[in-house]
């Protein structure tokens, strides 16, 4: 009986996703697409754009950061929504 109970606990732990994490794109500007799993509890992704001497720059990642005036920011809350 103890063996059966232990087996059920192990199977339940392995099969259940006990910590869901958001996945966001994190490539910069025109780099090839890459994604990353966000820290536990971080439920949003961002796409930040600005211009400088190099041209148009895009930064992507987890969260929704505060930005300075003149920087475009788009935050979203679904998988891979920040491309």
Curated annotation (Swiss-Prot):
Location in or out of the cell: Secreted
Signal sequence region: 1-21
Stated name of the protein: Short neurotoxin NCA-04
Gene3D superfamilies named among the record's database cross-references: CD59 (2.10.60.10)
Entry similarity comment: Belongs to the three-finger toxin family. Short-chain subfamily. Type I alpha-neurotoxin sub-subfamily.
Entry-linked InterPro entries: Snake_3FTx, Snake_toxin-like_sf, Snake_toxin_con_site, Toxin_cobra-type
Role summary: Binds to muscle nicotinic acetylcholine receptor (nAChR) and inhibit acetylcholine from binding to the receptor, thereby impairing neuromuscular transmission.
Disulfide-linked positions: 24-45, 38-62, 64-75, 76-81
Origin: domain of life: Eukaryota
Transmembrane feature ranges: none
Tissue: Expressed by the venom gland.
Molecular function per GO: acetylcholine receptor inhibitor activity; ion channel regulator activity; toxin activity
A Pfam family of this chain: Toxin_cobra-type
Main location: secreted
Alphabetized UniProt keyword annotations: Acetylcholine receptor inhibiting toxin, Disulfide bond, Ion channel impairing toxin, Neurotoxin, Postsynaptic neurotoxin, Secreted, Signal, Toxin
Record GO cellular component, one term: extracellular region
């Amino acid at each position: 009986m103890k063996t059966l109970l232990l087996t059920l606990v192990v199977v339940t732990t392995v099969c259940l996703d006990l910590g869901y994490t958001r996945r966001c794109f994190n490539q910069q500007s025109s780099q090839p697409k890459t994604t990353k799993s966000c820290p536990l509890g971080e439920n949003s992704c961002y796409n930040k754009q600005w211009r400088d001497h190099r041209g148009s720059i895009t930064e992507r990642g987890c969260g929704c950061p505060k930005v300075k005036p003149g920087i475009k920011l788009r935050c979203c809350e679904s998988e891979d929504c920040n491309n």
